[in-house]
Amino acid sequence: PSLFSLMDNERVKAAWGVPTIWLGLLAEMRKQKRKPQDFSFMLSGGSAVPRSMIQELEKEFGVDVTHGWGMTECSPVGSTTTLGSQAKELSFDEKVELKTYQGRRMYTVDMRIVGEDGKLLPHDGKAFGELQVKGHAIIDGYHEDEEASVAAMTEDGWLKTGDVARITPEGFMMLVDRTKDLIKSGGEWISSIDLENAAQGHPSIMECAVISAYHPQWGERPLLIAVTENDVTLNLEDIHEYLNDKVAKWWLPDDVVFVEELPHTATGKISKMTLREQFKDYKFEHSES
């Protein structure tokens, strides 16, 4: 049976999973024009949840969305978007904005962000750097693997997560990207996650990913790889028109490739490693721009 049918028949009230799972379920909910009966809460982690998905699930279907972040090394949850009592005073759009964050740290979890120079960065909601965590439920090394332990831990005992994040004064953490997925264009950073989430809001895009591709002038430029709904035909101009008021102009992807499906890992995440290998020799048509 489909996931929709399974949840409907079993009267599932709450469910946990990665965004790829929920995007597929949401597509079926649109077709059925309803949600699975009794379904009222979902927790999503593993990768960033698109704003458009949160808005639609909450506004159109009445499903409460909670965003989370974690790692196996954190046992596994590190943060969730529990809004607290102050949420009563927030508008719907303000609540959605907070839910695009990966949330506030769990009890006993400490978080900090560190710049490329190794210095601590302020929790001002603007500065971003590598997210590092420490706590009673977080590893201090890998069993019988000293080399991996040394690479993963700082000298003062913090775990290097490999995620790039910013943290607000109120303690809300938002992932900017994985360190290996950031795009450095002309010396400036572009977040593949932010660009993906913006593009994901297009009504004809079912799923998408952004990777860097070589550019002779800028070093790297974003390449959007997308799956469309019901074989809808789009082009780069359509994508730019949609994204123009959502991201900086220099963030706009230099090209878009449409595919039948994206590769996924065993846990349902989009496999950017596979995409990078597949498009490693990609050349932009207008690379002189």
Where do the PLM segments sit?
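Conserved beta-loop-beta connector loops within the AMP-binding
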Residues: 104-132, 151-152, 169-170, 232-236, ...
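Beta-strand->loop->alpha-helix junctions that form or flank phosphate-binding loops
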Residues: 66-73, 103-105, 210-214
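AMP-binding/adenylate-forming catalytic core of the ANL superfamily
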Residues: 8, 15, 135, 140-141, ...
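Active-site glycine-centered loops adjacent to acidic/histidine catalytic or metal-binding residues
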Residues: 46, 70, 103, 163, ...
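Acidic/polar alpha-helix N-cap and adjacent early helical turns
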Residues: 278-289
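Gly/Ser/Thr-rich phosphate-binding loop
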Residues: 12-17, 26-97, 110, 117, ...
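Conserved ANL (AMP-binding/adenylate-forming) active-site segment centered on the GW(Y/F)…HTG consensus within
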Residues: 62, 94-99, 124, 138-162, ...
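Conserved ATP-dependent adenylate/AMP-binding module captured primarily in the ANL superfamily
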Residues: 1-13
